């Protein structure tokens, strides 16, 4: 889980090496989500991921992250199903690209992400 290690490293760089952040992970079955996407059952995908976000809310998390690009295909629909603030990987990527003055970016991902324009539009 590279993202977990990266979060810990960055946190300790900022806060101190003798500290660790409290992190709650709600892992979903991506294969189930992919089957729902293949069947174009987008409302069920939003409900499935939204329910996971609500589990994080019940765990008293301050915000949520979806560590894959593909769920962001339905970011607004998922956010509408939970009161937990979700951070958008798309908005974060746009902000980082602008800050670094990047003009051409590459994206490697699932067929669902690659066949959609949700990641291209903001750029």
Where would I find each of the regions flagged by the language model?
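Short, acidic/small-residue loops that bind anionic groups at enzyme active sites
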Residues: 15-18, 78-98
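Hydrophobic alpha-helical segments within soluble ligand-binding/sensing domains
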Residues: 45-54, 87-105
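N-terminal glycine-rich "phosphate-gripper" loop used for MgATP/nucleotide binding
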Residues: 59-75
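Short, glycine-/small-residue-rich phosphate/pyrophosphate-handling segment
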Residues: 102-123
């Amino acid at each position: 889980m590279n993202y977990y290690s990266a979060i810990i490293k960055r946190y300790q760089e900022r806060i101190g090496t003798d500290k660790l952040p409290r992190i709650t992970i709600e892992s979903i079955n991506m294969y189930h989500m992919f089957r729902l996407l293949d069947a174009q059952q987008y409302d069920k995908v939003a409900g499935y991921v939204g329910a996971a976000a609500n589990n994080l809310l019940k765990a008293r998390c301050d915000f949520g992250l979806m560590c894959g690009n593909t769920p962001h295909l339905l970011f607004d629909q998922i956010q509408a199903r939970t009161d937990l603030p979700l951070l958008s990987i798309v908005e974060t990527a746009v902000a980082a690209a602008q800050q670094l003055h990047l003009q051409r970016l590459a994206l490697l991902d699932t067929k669902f992400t690659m066949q959609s324009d949700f990641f291209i539009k903001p750029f």
